[in-house]
């Protein structure tokens, strides 16, 4: 029996799709990422200030102890969220984002926390939470992840990680994250990626009035 050659290619389709999913975000030059749409210049400046503050910590690592300066900065927040002093051994992604907000002078619109889920709750209380599929974030927004693959394909579970949106380009989002593989570094994800739990949206416009 003669098998048409095109049917022999079918097993390769999942591999090709997986390769596109994994490698495509990593092929976009960093300078391409930016604002998906225009915002007032004063708001743009505030958002850029937070992003620049976070990105200045790129390369900070646990193994050489350089992340401790970020933890120390977070622990100067008064009062400390939950009254808890973060240790150098704790997961520090949320502390990273909160320390960046402190350094940028934006704690009045960005709720500080060392817990991803408690920070989500704080954004929700401020009515600054968004989890609709297709949301287009801006630089300076907070992106929360849930790494547990959702059985219903609707990511509404427990958030294990958070980062700060650096910018978007087409279907991609570039993020600066603390405690990404134990250091501070960039991640590029697909907009609508299954692992995105939602976004905390600081009210930058309120500081520009």
Where are these regions (language model features)?
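Terminal low-complexity, poorly structured segments
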Residues: 8-13, 69, 76, 118, ...
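N-terminal capping segments
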Residues: 24-106
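...with weaker cross-activation on analogous glycine-rich loops/strands in unrelated enzymes
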Residues: 107-182
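Short, Lys/Arg-rich N-terminal segment immediately upstream of the first membrane anchor
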Residues: 1-5
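Intrinsic disorder/low-complexity signature
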Residues: 59-64, 69-72, 114, 138, ...
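Solvent-exposed, flexible loop/coil residues
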Residues: 74-78, 124-130, 184, 193
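Aromatic- and glycine-rich peptidoglycan recognition patches
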Residues: 7-10, 14-44, 149, 153-209
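The N-terminal extracellular segments of secreted preproproteins, especially immediately downstream
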Residues: 92, 113-115, 194, 207
């Amino acid at each position: 029996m003669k098998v048409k050659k095109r049917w022999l290619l079918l097993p390769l389709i999942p591999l090709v799709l997986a390769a596109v999913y994994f490698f495509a975000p990593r092929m976009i030059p960093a300078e391409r990422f930016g604002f998906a749409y225009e915002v007032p210049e004063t708001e743009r400046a505030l958002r850029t200030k937070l992003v620049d503050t976070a990105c200045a910590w790129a390369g900070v690592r646990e193994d050489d102890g350089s992340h401790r300066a970020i933890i120390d900065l977070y622990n100067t927040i008064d009062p400390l969220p939950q009254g808890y002093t973060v240790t150098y051994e704790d997961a520090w992604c949320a502390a990273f984002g909160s320390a960046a907000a402190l350094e940028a002078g934006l704690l009045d619109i960005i709720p500080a926390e060392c817990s991803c889920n408690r920070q989500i709750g704080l954004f929700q209380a401020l009515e600054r939470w968004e989890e609709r599929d297709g949301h287009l974030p801006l630089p300076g927004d907070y992106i929360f992840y849930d790494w547990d693959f959702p059985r219903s394909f609707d990511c509404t579970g427990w958030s294990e990680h958070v980062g700060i949106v650096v910018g978007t380009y087409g279907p991609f989002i570039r993020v600066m994250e603390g405690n990404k593989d134990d250091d501070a570094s960039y991640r590029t994800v697909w907009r609508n990626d299954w692992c995105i739990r939602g976004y905390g949206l600081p009210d930058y416009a309120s500081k520009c009035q």
